[in-house]
Regions:
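Structural motif
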Residues: 68, 96, 300-302, 348, ...
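Conserved short alpha-helical segments that host acidic/polar catalytic motifs at enzyme active sites
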Residues: 1-250, 254-255, 266-300, 338, ...
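Glycine-rich phosphate-binding loops that contact phosphosugars or nucleotide phosphates
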Residues: 293-445, 527-566, 570, 589
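Glycine-rich, anion-gripping cofactor-binding loops and their flanking helix/strand elements
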Residues: 183-208, 334-368, 507-543, 573-587, ...
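Generic C-terminus detector
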Residues: 257, 548, 561-563, 573-614
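Glycine-rich oxoanion-binding loops at beta->alpha junctions
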Residues: 67, 71-84, 279-292, 316-352, ...
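Active-site phosphate/pyrophosphate-binding segments
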Residues: 154, 264-268, 272-302, 392-521, ...
């Protein structure tokens, strides 16, 4: 959600902070700000509503000197988007400037307590309460900043990632986290700080991921010091990250989202590299090899996820049940964690998250672990909280996803779920060798089939203009195509702001058919499958009510082509692999409609890439 950046060292902090905020724009935000310790030890704070570019204009001609600072992009949780509510927030005496990601649940109680002691507040945010609390504790006890932060955080209930600078101690930054990500970049006599590693790849590939309850003390030229709230040292070794600048640039595309749609063939190849042997048509997953006993004795799989990852989980359910004959439940993590679910020690919980930082999914993991379940994580970001909280798992290896609307992460998640189901099905003996090799062989061919679909982008761009002013959409699919329909509807909602709903095609008669008329576009995934004839009947019913049909069909299907207003043809593949190919035209359709409507495709309103608060 919010993005934090910090720097302390010998370089000028301002350009590093601004560049870092731009790297974090993909997380979503409504305002931005920065605090700089100037060369004359003045604490200068600049804020603006809008984009990072607006912050740059605000600071034009101002004193942006200094080699120490923190910065922030805010996504409003407490208080509307405004300059006053933007971070950094300052203490009563103006000595401290703090940036914060998360939610302080008991902020109202703390605020009342501070007001009774004479503190006054300028904003309506929980963050200002936190910095005022730290400042009050520091002033009352004449304490150093670290001790004041430790004492203040003991009173806090909620989630936080914070970075604090102190005018009286201009040679340090104090950073802390609980249930919200924070990464320290380690350079030569300098430190970088950010919500994820993307802002620091220009300067260092050595990072330390802070764990819950840890506080980092960053001083230029000094070793990194990490302690807990009780001042007990927490040893860490820096990890080497493999990000490169090219992965964080558009590469000639007008938007990151379009680039990431077109990246998918290569991403899926990367996801399979080292795991799929195309010569022997076999799959090797180290997580399955190393934890075979725990996975094979599972009486049930429970998939927990949110948003797009939940849709991937629905496909995973069908794959695992079909290949492994093990029952699978798919749960919204936000519902699962609060409904007192029945969890058995022989359950395997699969947690799916692109960022690896989704707050509700992390909470669901902790609940399942507390009841003895084995946890398998599927995420994209190496070293993320979910990757560290699970017993084992698989990275999707699709590279940084900058567009807020997920594309390549979705197909990466589906690919890993396919590999997991194949590996387990073979180990269990529930998938015949012939079928196993046939599916793997087809899976190897998927990237090239994706490229074939992408060649139709001009056609999809052309007819998407016909739906620029549509107010509603219905998406339909059956079997493996139903989650694809859900994901297609979500993509359209996210970036074009058109209301869209996905349904199983058979459920059309149970309500949605009442909405169909000449003004209602219907997107239907109708590739060849055992249910093809039934889906064909659905299309005929839609056309009988003058509905406009966009059909995703298998190459050579002339029957539906003659019925539909527009049809997008896909290369033939196995039904279980159709989602990998069929999702691409729906991503392109959503993208081009949003572009026609003049929307901010990469940073749609009110959305955050990484939902790190509940």
């Amino acid at each position: 959600m919010c993005g934090i950046v910090g720097y302390i060292g010998k370089r000028k902090a301002w350009p590093i902070l601004v560049e870092g905020l731009k790297r974090l724009e993909y997380r979503g935000y409504d305002s931005a700000g920065a605090a700089l310790m100037s060369d004359t030890h003045q604490l200068n704070v600049y804020k603006s509503v809008g984009k990072v570019a607006d912050l740059e204009r605000t600071a034009e001609g101002q004193d942006v000197s200094g080699c120490v600072g923190n910065a922030h992009t805010r996504w409003a949780t407490h208080g509307e988007p405004s300059t006053v509510n933007a971070h950094p927030h300052c203490s009563q005496n103006g000595d401290l400037a703090l940036v914060h990601n998360g939610i302080i649940e008991n902020y109202a109680v703390l605020k009342e307590k501070l007001q009774a002691k004479g503190c006054t507040f300028k904003s309506s945010t929980d963050t200002e309460v936190l910095v005022q609390l730290i400042g009050y504790i520091q002033q009352q006890g004449n304490l150093d900043l670290l001790t004041a932060v430790q004492l203040a955080l003991r009173e806090v209930i909620g989630a936080y990632a914070i970075a604090v600078v102190d005018r009286k101690h201009p040679d340090e930054i104090i950073a802390a986290r609980k249930s919200s990500p924070l990464v320290v970049g380690v350079g030569e006599g300098e430190f970088f700080l950010a919500s994820d590693a993307t802002p620091m790849v220009t300067y260092t590939n050595q990072v330390v991921y802070l764990s819950d309850g840890e506080i980092a003390v960053l001083r230029a030229g000094a070793p990194l010091k990490i302690v807990d709230l009780n001042n007990v040292e927490c040893p860490h070794e820096a990890q080497t990250i493999a990000l490169n600048i090219g992965q964080l640039e558009k590469g000639g595309f007008p938007h990151f989202m379009l680039k990431e749609i077109f990246d998918q063939p290569d991403c899926i190849s990367d996801c399979m590299r080292g795991r799929v042997n195309p010569d022997t048509c076999t799959v090797t997953l180290s997580a399955v090899s190393n934890y075979k006993e725990q996975l094979l004795r599972a009486g049930r799989f429970i998939i927990v996820a949110c948003g797009t990852s939940w849709h991937a989980g629905l496909i995973g359910k069908q794959l695992i049940e079909s290949f492994c004959r093990i029952p699978v439940e798919v749960e919204y993590a936000s519902e699962f964690r609060y409904r007192n679910p029945v969890i058995h020690p022989d359950d395997v919980v699969i947690a799916i998250s692109q960022s690896g930082e989704t707050a509700d999914t992390l909470a669901a993991i902790e609940l399942a672990k507390s009841q003895g379940a084995f946890i398998y994580g599927i995420c994209n970001v190496i070293g993320s909280s979910i990757a560290r909280a699970t017993d084992t798992g698989s990275y999707i290896h699709v590279g940084p996803e900058i567009g807020v609307a997920s594309t390549k992460a979705f197909t990466g998640q589906v690919t890993v779920l396919t590999l997991l189901a194949l590996a387990l099905g073979r180990e269990k003996g529930t998938l015949s060798e012939e079928e196993y090799h046939r599916i793997v062989k087809e899976l190897v061919a998927v990237p090239e089939k994706m490229r074939t679909v992408l060649k139709q982008h001009s056609f999809i761009s052309y007819f998407s203009k016909m739906f620029t002013y549509a107010r509603n959409f219905i998406y339909l699919g059956r079997g493996y195509a139903f989650p694809v329909a859900l994901e297609g509807a979500l993509k359209l909602k996210e970036i074009s702001y058109i209301h869209a709903e996905g349904y199983p095609a058979a459920e059309m008669k149970h309500g949605p058919i009442a909405l169909i008329d000449a003004e209602m576009p219907v997107v239907i995934v109708a590739t060849q499958s055992p249910l093809y004839e039934k889906v064909l009947s659905n299309i005929q019913e839609i056309k009988a009510r003058k509905g406009r049909v966009v059909a995703v069909v298998t190459e050579g299907d002339t029957v539906i082509r003659n019925l539909a207003d527009y049809s997008i043809e896909l290369p033939a593949t196995l039904e279980c692999l159709d989602p990998l190919v069929a999702s691409i035209p729906l991503q392109l359709l959503a993208y081009y409609i949003a572009v026609c409507r003049g929307m901010d495709v990469d940073q749609p309103r009110n959305l955050a890439k990484s939902v790190t608060v509940e």
